Each structure stands twice: as structure tokens, then as C-alpha cells.
């Protein structure tokens, strides 16, 4: 089971409550920076550019940036698939994401969407390539608790996360992606996958991923897995394998600590995707709101 977190703050905070709300999925974000009219030049350019993204992203290793038009009618777009996606899977994911994005944001000049399998699509009327954008973001965590010694767990987890973040940040201009796993005692392993849009610099990729790791730690320390998604980066770790390993993108790790406890219960089996499990009702969503004046 998973919980999705979003933070909303109100002024004059006197007391705090956490309020649970109904199940939701991961939805596209429509920016309020401007609209275009039906059959306008900008609208036609947007449709043409988005239509080209699934084919070009899948043929280009899972990442593409593109532009079309001139002046105020120019459209900028980016699409990226998770680093272990096949070309066929990438095409399908980007195509589905675009259709959902266009249905939800039919006339917005800027919109952004991701799926649970981390297919990212972003378009705008201005250049955003290479720019670090931390919001909008979403955090999702597994409600199961870590049953190992937390001090030992934290040491192993931090070493693993540092390794995959360094590996991904040092990637190329076509792929900034890394996976890794680490032994937790003799009976468990921790798995992690991180990725940035490769238009980011090494420093900006590192910053995006480390802020995502910090967000997970601040909200969900001690849980059995988690995901943080941002416009420029994806951070996920679990206590079960959930990606296709590849030697060229696997981070090198230090030897793990010696086991100090008997085998704990196995973690939950991997879901098909974060998004699909939300839609099936297997994820619980909660919005953390700071409410004033409650006695």
C-alpha cells in the first residue's frame, strides 16, 4: 500500500492536522501562464510537435527535446522515458501521456505530465531546456515499515542513494540514469533507481535528486519504499527488484555491514506501476494540510 503526499500551507498557523482524502491518480498539470485559441498557429504547432514526440523519443534512446514555429507561436517540448524502457514501451508510454495531457489541458500554453512508469512530457511557449524545476512534485511511499535495525538500515540506504545519485549525475547528455542494490544484512536487499532529464547539468541533476531524497527522508523515514517525481528527476527505492538491471547503468557500491538480526518478513511484491496501483485502489492518498484555529 502506498500514500501520496502533497503539501499545502495556510498563514497564521496555530495548530496542525493531517487530513486524509480520497484515492487519486497522478494527473497532468495545466499551467495558468496563458491560453491559446482553437485552430490558432500556436495550437497547430503544439499538436504537430506533440504528435512527433513518441516516435522521436523512442528512436533517440528515450529522450528528446524539440521546437517548432517562430516568435510567439514557437513551441518547446520535451519527452523522456524511464531508462530501462524498451523503444516499444517508450513509444506507448509517451503516446498515452500526450493524449491524457491534451485531454486535460486542451488550450493551455504550458502543461506537464508524468505517469507512474515515469514517462515525462512537458511543453511550453518558452524555453525550459536545462532549467531545474522542482515543482510540481509528488511523493508516494509504501506504508509498510522497515523491520531491520534502523541505524544499520540508514547507513546502507544512504550509501546506496549516494552511489546512484553520483552515477546518474555523471551521465551523458543523452542519459542521466542509474540503478543499484545493496545488501541489508544476510536476508534483504535495497533497490534504487534515479533519473534526470539529460538536458540538466551534472550539478543540477545532483541537486534535484538529493532534494528528492531529502523530501522522502523528511516525510517517510522508516517506510519500505518510496517515489518522488519532479519535472526534471525521478527518485525511487524499494525492498524488491522493480527495474531491468544493466551493467552500464549500475552504480558501484561499498561492501554492506554484517547482518545483525534474523530475517524479517518479505516486502510487498512489486506493483505493475505506481500509477496503475493508484487506479486499482491499492494506494491511499493523503494531503498534508496545515490548518489554523483548530482547538
List each model region and its residues.
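Extracellular secretory-pathway ectodomains and N-terminal mature segments of eukaryotic proteins
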Residues: 2-295
Amino acid at each position: 500500500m502506498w500514500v501520496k503526499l502533497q503539501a499545502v500551507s495556510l498563514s497564521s498557523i496555530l495548530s496542525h492536522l493531517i487530513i486524509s482524502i480520497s484515492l487519486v491518480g497522478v494527473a497532468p498539470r495545466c499551467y495558468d501562464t496563458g491560453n491559446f485559441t482553437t485552430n490558432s498557429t500556436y495550437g497547430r504547432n503544439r499538436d504537430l510537435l506533440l504528435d512527433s514526440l513518441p516516435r522521436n523519443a523512442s528512436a533517440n534512446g528515450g529522450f528528446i527535446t524539440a521546437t517548432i514555429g517562430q516568435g510567439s507561436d514557437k513551441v518547446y517540448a520535451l519527452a523522456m522515458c524511464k531508462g530501462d524502457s524498451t523503444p516499444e514501451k517508450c513509444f506507448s508510454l509517451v503516446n498515452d501521456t500526450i493524449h491524457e495531457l491534451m485531454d486535460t489541458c486542451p488550450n493551455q500554453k504550458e502543461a506537464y505530465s508524468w505517469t507512474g512508469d515515469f514517462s515525462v512530457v512537458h511543453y511550453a511557449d518558452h524555453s525550459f531546456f536545462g532549467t531545474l524545476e522542482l515543482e510540481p512534485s509528488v511523493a508516494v511511499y509504501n506504508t509498510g515499515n522497515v523491520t531491520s535495525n534502523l541505524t544499520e538500515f540508514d547507513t546502507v540506504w544512504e550509501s546506496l542513494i549516494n552511489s546512484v545519485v553520483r552515477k546518474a549525475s555523471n551521465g551523458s547528455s543523452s542519459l542521466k540514469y542509474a540503478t543499484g542494490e545493496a545488501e541489508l544484512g544476510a536476508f534483504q536487499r535495497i533497490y534504487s533507481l534515479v533519473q534526470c532529464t539529460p538536458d540538466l547539468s551534472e550539478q543540477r541533476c545532483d541537486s534535484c535528486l538529493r532534494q528528492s531524497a531529502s523530501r522522502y527522508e523528511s516525510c517517510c523515514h522508516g517506510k519500505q519504499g518510496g517515489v518522488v517525481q519532479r519535472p526534471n528527476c525521478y527518485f525511487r527505492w524499494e525492498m524488491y527488484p522493480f527495474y531491468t538491471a544493466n551493467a552500464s547503468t549500475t552504480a558501484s557500491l561499498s561492501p554492506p555491514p554484517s547482518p545483525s538480526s534474523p530475517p524479517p518478513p518479505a516486502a510487498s511484491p512489486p506493483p505493475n506501476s505506481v500509477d496503475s496501483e493508484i487506479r486499482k485502489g491499492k494506494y491511499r492518498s493523503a494531503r498534508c494540510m496545515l490548518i489554523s484555529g483548530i482547538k
